[in-house]
UniProtKB/Swiss-Prot annotation:
Region (Sufficient for interaction with ZNF628): 99-240
Tissue specificity annotation: Highly expressed in the testes and ovary, whereas lower levels are detected in most other tissues.
One GO CC term, this protein: nucleus
Compositional bias ranges of the Polar residues kind: 794-812
Organism lineage string: Eukaryota, Metazoa, Chordata, Craniata, Vertebrata
Gene: Taf4b
UniProt motif (Nuclear export signal) ranges: 509-549
Name assigned to this protein: Transcription initiation factor TFIID subunit 4B
Sequence segments annotated as region (Disordered): 788-812
């Protein structure tokens, strides 16, 4: 809009301007607004000052513990023209809010130009007339707050102080977010412009006060937040304002669908750009999302290409979901490229500063978002100061101040000038220490001055000397930053007191001449309501850390805590077992980050020892150390029985000992000889058993052996050939005899007579064999079926007597008999040949003779 102010939804009452210059408005949520317009006198002044006062009468409790106060200041700009001066147009103030009610004026009522119609709290209509201003003089409209505002409130004061033009100042007083936990926060933003009459653009400032409950917090600073600010352009600012306006106009159901769709696309890009996927897949998925957000392709085409790229099964509910939410998402995300870059940055790198475990009640988190000022031709510093004052706590030491300063510096997009944006976060609270005047300061220079998420907890080294000293801990960026000193709080506010107890830690490098002493540091965050506190003890050491951001490595010098655990275990016998383990927080966080989609949590759930909090190494050490003293202390034994008869053995030993003058024999010697004999026989039997098993082993069916020569089969084949040859000869001889017997020759040949006689004998022999076979068959038939042997009665009894098959199957089972290994003399000879002591003995010679 060319002139005037635009209030966000919910911050002021809706105002609707008519064509005649009248302004009609109605109160929303009991929030009255008074708008005064002041015309400008003739002269080179190009801006018309307008003063708007928005005041809240009663605190408004919100359903959620998050309160967001958005204040936008758009100064009135006009181009200077040469020529006759003329009066400016009446100022138009427009606030677009759903459900606006207008004031209907009578038809005969005409408002003079420049007057404003305002409805008061009591329902009366008031006309406000403008006041003339002197040409070239500075005009400032001051509005004092009403006394109905409560004391514990949040005040945002935004002042635009030009050098030689008008001044625009607005005070906004809003009720606290939560009545129980009220934090007085004062935010002052001051911007100075040049007197050259060139346009000055002031971007919006967003201040978010979020009380959150932190349990087991891991504080993480993104790598994108370390570096230098980039100056946004006017187009980006306009797109951002358009998206905010579109978001306020959408219904809650559509906003919920848009949020789900945005999370779906963000998770899709993160999974595609993770380390386990190929780079081509990540590029293709990002291109598809960009085309979908830019309306180059529709939801059907997007899902079809996405299924092909990810090689996944079609999802029937995805296309209706995208059709329902992608149109509104395009309105809220006018720049799809920045959305994709933010998703990729979240995947690319997280610089974990430190991780601490805290159990606290509701604690405030102040998040400030500041964008730089665009100034042409001059330097325009801009400071955003956030001060938080907490109730002092009683302690033995002097109340000191801990200052946390966040600096953000970036060059402005202007010619011949730079812009510095400084954010100062001051927390005034007592530190219970034995040495007074100790200040602990932390300075951060982020690339994007957006501090979001949970509270940032850093291991801050402190130094104590007897006098005032400061120990800054800096995370420098690639470009120099402007350091500003801490400011003093205006009013003490009623809030949740927080006590931070710090003990002296290792000293940072100090100036020469100052004594340095190594200290131990312990940080305790404590709530006065009696909640449980976990102590986090760490030995800090400085270690260089390099982070990669858009192809540029930025060194970060931070204090990384290394946790050291020393546990002593008392063992039996007054022994102490010390276990020491050191682990850096960076290593533990790398394990969590570098895992495949990070799924160490599932392994911990499946690990029974982890869930039961059992340390296996410690348990093993205790078991080994506990039982080491009992080894060998208790001896269990039984009385030995002699293998040989003691009387016969002793007599035999004495008979042999007479040759060596041995007349007496100890009982231990007899037992030893008996035991030695037993062991010798046991060894021989084991060897003989092995040899016999090898002898009976059939290697033919084994897969480890291949048959090379089979002599037995060859011999059987030759025997079979001999039998066939013999049968052939017998058959030829028989045929010859039969021919001779049938011949009827009258010659008295003796050879012929011999053949005839032999043929008759052969025939008689065959006839006798046939008769013998028939007699055997007749006798077997008369005797009946022979009785089956018990070993073979299991299966054959079924065929002979089917009626008794049920009982015979139970009684015919073979009893279990232990396998007996039979050892023959050949095995003994082979064993004696293999032993060196018996290879040349007389026993082997006698065995060979047998």
């Amino acid at each position: 809009m060319p002139a005037g102010l635009t209030e966000p939804a919910g911050a002021a009452a809706p105002v609707v301007s008519s064509a005649s210059g009248a302004v009609t408005m109605a109160p929303v949520a009991a929030l009255p607004v008074r708008v005064e317009g002041t015309p400008v006198a003739l002269g080179p002044v190009t801006k018309a000052p307008v003063s708007v006062c928005v005041e809240s009468v009663a605190p408004q409790p919100l359903p959620a513990p998050v309160g967001t106060l958005v204040t936008k200041v758009v100064p009135v700009t006009a181009l200077p023209k040469l020529g006759s001066p003329r009066l400016p147009a009446p100022q138009i103030v427009t606030v677009k809010t759903p459900g606006t009610t207008t004031i209907q004026l009578p038809a005969n009522l005409q408002l003079p130009p420049g007057t404003v119609l305002i409805k008061s709290n009591s329902g009366q209509l008031m006309l406000v007339s403008p006041q003339q201003a002197v040409t070239g003089a500075k005009t400032t409209s001051n509005i004092t707050p009403r006394p109905a505002v409560p004391a514990n409130t949040q005040t945002v004061k935004i002042c635009t102080v030009p050098n030689s033009s008008s001044q625009l100042m607005k005070k906004v007083t809003v009720a606290p977010v939560k009545n129980l936990t009220q934090i007085g926060t004062t935010v002052a933003t001051t911007a100075s412009s040049t007197s050259s009459g060139q346009p000055v653009a002031l971007p919006s400032s967003v201040i978010t006060v979020t009380p959150a409950k932190l349990v087991n917090t891991v504080s993480t600073l993104k790598s994108s937040s370390l570096g230098v600010l980039s100056t946004p352009s006017n187009d980006a600012r306009l797109k951002a304002e358009t998206s905010v306006a579109a978001q306020t106009a959408l219904p809650p159901t559509v906003l919920e669908n848009v949020k789900k769709c945005k999370n779906f696309l963000s998770m899709l890009i993160k999974l595609a750009c993770s380390g386990s996927q190929s780079p081509e897949m990540g590029q293709n998925v990002k291109r598809l999302v960009e085309q979908l957000l830019d309306a180059e392709i529709e939801a059907e085409e997007f899902t079809r290409k996405l299924y092909i790229e990810l090689k996944s099964a079609p999802q029937p509910h995805l296309v209706p979901f995208l059709k329902k939410s992608v149109v509104a998402l395009r309105q809220l995300l006018p720049n799809s490229q920045s959305f994709i870059e933010n998703c990729v940055k979240e995947v690319s790198g997280d610089v974990v500063i430190s991780s601490c475990t805290m159990t606290t009640a509701t604690s405030p988190v102040v998040t400030s978002t500041v964008s730089p000022v665009l100034v042409s031709g001059a330097t325009a510093p801009r400071t955003l100061s956030v001060q938080q004052t907490l109730n002092p706590l009683a302690g033995p030491g002097v109340a000191n101040t801990g200052v946390v300063t966040l600096h953000s510096v970036a060059p402005a997009a202007a010619t011949g000038g730079t812009t510095a944006a400084t954010v100062l976060l001051q927390t005034s609270k007592p530190l219970t220490t034995s040495v007074p005047n100790t200040v602990a300061a932390v300075s951060l220079q982020p690339e994007n001055p957006v501090v979001s998420g949970a509270a940032v907890t850093l291991a801050i080294p402190s130094a104590t000397f007897g006098e005032a000293s400061a120990t800054p801990l800096c995370l420098p960026s690639a470009k120099p930053a402007i350091t500003s000193a801490g400011t003093k709080a205006d009013k003490p506010a009623i809030g949740t007191p927080v006590q931070i107890v710090t003990q002296p830690s290792t000293l940072l490098p100090q100036a020469a001449g100052i004594p340095q002493t190594a200290k131990v540091k312990q940080l305790v965050v404590q709530q006065p309501s009696g909640s449980s506190v976990n102590h986090v003890t760490s030995i800090s050491h400085s270690s260089p850390l390099s982070t990669q951001n858009c192809g540029q490595k930025t060194p970060v010098n931070a204090v990384m805590p290394t946790s050291s655990i020393i546990k002593q275990i008392t063992l039996p016998g007054n022994k102490l077992l010390s276990l020491q383990a050191q682990r850096s927080s960076i290593q533990s966080n790398k394990i969590k980050e570098n895992g495949p989609t990070c799924f160490r949590g599932e392994d911990d759930i499946n690990d029974v020892t982890f869930m039961a909090e059992v340390n296996l190494d410690e348990e093993n050490a205790c078991i080994l150390a506990a039982h080491s003293d009992f080894v060998g202390t208790l001896i269990q034994s039984c009385k030995e029985e002699p293998f040989l008869v003691i009387g016969a053995l002793q007599k035999r030993i004495l008979d042999i000992g007479k040759k060596h003058d041995i007349t007496e024999l100890n009982s231990d010697a007899v037992n030893l000889i008996s035991h030695a004999t037993q062991e010798r026989l046991r060894g021989l039997l084991e060897k003989l058993t092995t040899i016999a098993q090898h002898r009976m082993t059939i290697y033919k069916g084994s897969e480890n052996y291949i048959l090379s020569t089979d002599t037995r089969s060859q011999l059987k084949f030759l025997e079979k050939l001999d039998q066939l040859e013999k049968q052939r000869k017998d058959l030829e001889e028989r045929e010859m005899l039969l021919k001779a017997a049938k011949s009827r020759s009258n010659k008295e040949d003796p050879e012929q007579l011999r053949l005839k006689q032999k043929a008759k004998e052969l025939q008689q022999l065959e006839l006798a064999q046939i008769q013998y076979r028939d007699a055997n068959l007749t006798a077997l038939a008369a005797i009946g079926p022979r009785k089956k042997r018990p070993l073979e009665s299991g299966n054959e009894s079924f065929k002979d007597n089917p009626s008794t098959s049920g009982t015979s199957s139970l009684t015919a089972t073979k009893p279990f008999r232990p396998r007996i290994t039979r050892i023959c003399l050949r095995d003994l000879i082979f064993c004696m040949e293999q032993e060196r002591e018996m290879k040349y003995s007389r026993a082997l010679y006698l065995a060979l003779l047998k």
